[in-house]
Swiss-Prot record:
Organism, scientific name: Mus musculus (Mouse)
Note: Substrate peptides must be flexible in order to adopt an L-shaped conformation in the deep binding cleft.
Known role: Catalyzes the O-sulfation of tyrosine residues within acidic motifs of polypeptides, using 3'-phosphoadenylyl sulfate (PAPS) as cosubstrate.
Lineage of the species this protein comes from: Eukaryota, Metazoa, Chordata, Craniata, Vertebrata
Protein name: Protein-tyrosine sulfotransferase 2
Matches recorded under InterPro entries: P-loop_NTPase, TPST-like
Gene giving rise to this polypeptide: Tpst2
């Protein structure tokens, strides 16, 4: 027993001596750097400023802050999942499922900035805006790059990230933003009927949800306009559904990505290598396995309480600002392309395939509920 105690003490002494030796060596090196005038105490440069990933095709992909990231967002239930599935169908693009963590981290960063006391504490501790921004930049890029397969163009779809478009544009100056815009009445009806839990939204009240929708889209739209139309494109869900080819050509031109017919048939690439990866827990998965169709456009009509319909222009003034008629029930969104009419007939007849990895899931989970930060 005594021998083992001696061994422990000896080992601890050796470890302490080693730590002290390392610290002393570091101090000597720092002193030399200061004397040589080469040390900058305020900046550190990482050895590797890029993330390097190897794809299944054995192609090396390099990602950095200067790369043209794509951010897809909007109020939940506005078509963000459809948009990212269409982009995922492009051979050069990978979006993947919602990370859920990125909007939360952005919200924390915003909260620190808004709190004067917390900002002072961070500054006093040396955790300046420059330090925080560098950390946020590295974290967000790491999550986007590594939560899915590598691709030439990376995109992120977390609905609420576009509440921070201005900040993200500063972190990633070559990024582009797609703001999904949908008739708020349709978005809210979808939230309520599909029980999509979103923080702050009372799913028992159309009036409350429309008020919260108005506030959220107002913030996102203002951020989009501030970033500028050369960097942020509002995409109307109704027009994307009615005229997919025309809409997608405009979107890909905006993003600087070559056209590919695969974006018109995202449903054929679900679950396939290099295709569209879907999450079993996102509420829109059972919808985006279908071809683009008219099924969800006007489902909300006749379901909103009369008093809310009467006060719609006051409850949700952003409807009119975005070009929707707050008094039209149902509104006329336009005439669909022939391919969309054909797709709708197929969907109504059940003439579409459920991916093998999702078979049986929808029947088991159709009526289940789970907390969501927001999906669409």
């Amino acid at each position: 027993m005594r021998l083992s105690v001696r061994k422990v003490l000896l080992a601890a002494g050796c470890a302490l001596a080693l730590v002290l030796a390392v610290q002393l060596g570091q101090q000597v090196l720092e002193c030399r750097a200061v004397l040589g005038g080469t040390r900058n105490p305020r900046r550190m440069r990482p050895e590797q400023e890029e993330l390097v990933m190897l794809g299944a095709d054995h192609v090396e992909y390099r990602y950095g802050k200067a790369m043209p990231l794509i951010f897809v967002g909007g109020v939940p239930r506005s078509g963000t999942t459809l948009m990212r599935a269409m982009l995922d169908a492009h051979p050069e693009v990978r979006c993947g499922e919602e990370t859920r963590i990125i909007p939360r981290v952005l919200a924390m960063r915003q909260a620190w900035t808004k709190s004067g006391r917390e900002k002072l504490r961070l500054d006093e501790a040396g955790v300046t805006d420059e330090v925080l921004d560098a950390a946020m930049q590295a974290f967000i890029l790491e999550v986007i790059a590594k939560h899915g397969e590598p691709a030439r163009v990376l995109c992120n779809k977390d609905p609420f990230t576009l509440k921070s478009s201005v900040y993200l544009a500063r972190l990633f100056p070559n990024s582009k933003f797609l703001l999904m815009v949908r008739d708020g009445r349709a978005s809210v009806h979808s939230m309520i009927t599909r029980k999509v839990t979103i923080a702050g939204f009372d799913l028992s009240s159309y009036r409350d949800c429309l008020t919260k929708w108005n506030k959220a889209i107002e913030v996102m739209y203002a951020q989009c306009m501030e970033v500028g139309r050369d960097k942020c494109l509002p995409v109307y869900y109704e027009q994307l559904v009615l005229h997919p080819r025309r809409s997608l050509k405009r979107i890909l031109d905006f993003l600087g990505i070559a056209w590919s017919d695969t974006v018109l048939h995202h449903e054929d690439l679900i679950g396939k290598p290099g295709g569209v990866s879907l999450s079993k827990i996102e509420r829109s998965t059972d919808q985006v396995i279908k071809p683009v169709n008219l099924e969800a456009l006007s489902k909300w009509t006749g379901h909103i309480p009369r008093d809310v319909v009467r006060d719609m222009a006051q409850i949700a003034p952003m409807l009119a600002r975005l070009g929707y008629d707050p008094y039209a029930n149902p509104p006329n969104y336009g005439n669909p392309d022939p391919i969309v009419i054909n797709n709708t007939h197929r969907v109504l007849k059940g003439d579409y395939k459920t991916p093998a990895n999702l078979k049986g899931y929808f029947q088991v989970n159709q009526n289940s509920t789970s907390p969501h930060l927001g999906s669409s």
